[in-house]
Regions:
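Short, flexible loop/turn elements at secondary-structure junctions
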Residues: 54-56, 67-70, 154-159
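Domain-level recognition of nuclease-like catalytic cores that cleave nucleotide substrates
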Residues: 101-162
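Folded interaction cores of globular domains that provide primary macromolecule-binding surfaces
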Residues: 1-7, 47, 63, 69
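Catalytic cores of nucleic-acid endonucleases
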Residues: 68-120
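Short, mixed charged/polar active-site loops
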Residues: 47, 58-61, 147-149
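Active-site metal-binding core of divalent-cation-utilizing nuclease and nuclease-like domains
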Residues: 25-57, 74, 142
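Acidic-basic catalytic patches of nuclease active cores, encompassing PD-(D/E)XK
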Residues: 1-38
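Conserved catalytic cores of phosphodiester-cleaving nucleases, focusing on short active-site segments
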Residues: 24, 50-52, 61-68, 85-86
Length: 162
């Protein structure tokens, strides 16, 4: 969906984080059987942007936070927000979806990778799907032995003004 959105600027131009999130939630709602997809949903001690739950047992399957790129410090705070406020011990699959406005996408991807490896909860890289989607192993702040899979997904919304 994200790559498709990059090719269709009308899906993201003029939208804020919540508007773009709603496009993703709408698509996720129809993609999986036995799964609910919601936006701005309370989990642990805050409202996460995207939450996928198993219909049968109401367990969390996936949690995602959406952010526009505003530099490395803002990005690292977004990771901390996700881990400190939204994850319980049972949550193991999470994502940070980063929307990059304007140009210099390659430079931003380099800064994202650098920032991830500097983060206090970072353990190691797990799998690189491509240049814009990388899976990492992080640890929970309250249980350093508990590993969490964090997918960083970057989207090049180059038609948006920075």
């Amino acid at each position: 969906l994200g790559r498709s959105m990059e090719r269709k600027p009308s899906l993201y131009i003029g939208k804020d984080e919540e508007g773009i999130r709603d496009v993703f939630v709408t698509m996720l709602e129809t993609k999986f059987d036995g799964v609910t997809a919601t936006g701005e949903t309370f989990n642990y001690s805050g409202k996460t942007d995207i939450l996928l739950k198993n219909v049968d047992d109401n367990s969390n399957l996936f949690i995602a936070e959406c952010k526009f790129w505003h530099g490395q410090e803002h990005f690292k705070k977004a990771i901390s927000q996700l881990f400190d406020r939204y994850l319980t011990w049972r949550d193991s699959k999470v994502a940070l979806m980063v929307f990059v406005k304007g140009g210099n996408f390659t430079s931003v991807l380099d800064k994202i990778r650098e920032s991830v490896m500097q983060h206090v909860y970072y353990v190691r890289e797990n799998m690189k799907r491509d240049e814009t989607s990388v899976n990492y192993i992080f640890r929970l702040p309250k249980d350093p032995e508990k590993e969490v899979f964090l997918e960083i997904m970057a989207f090049n919304f180059d038609k948006m003004n920075p």
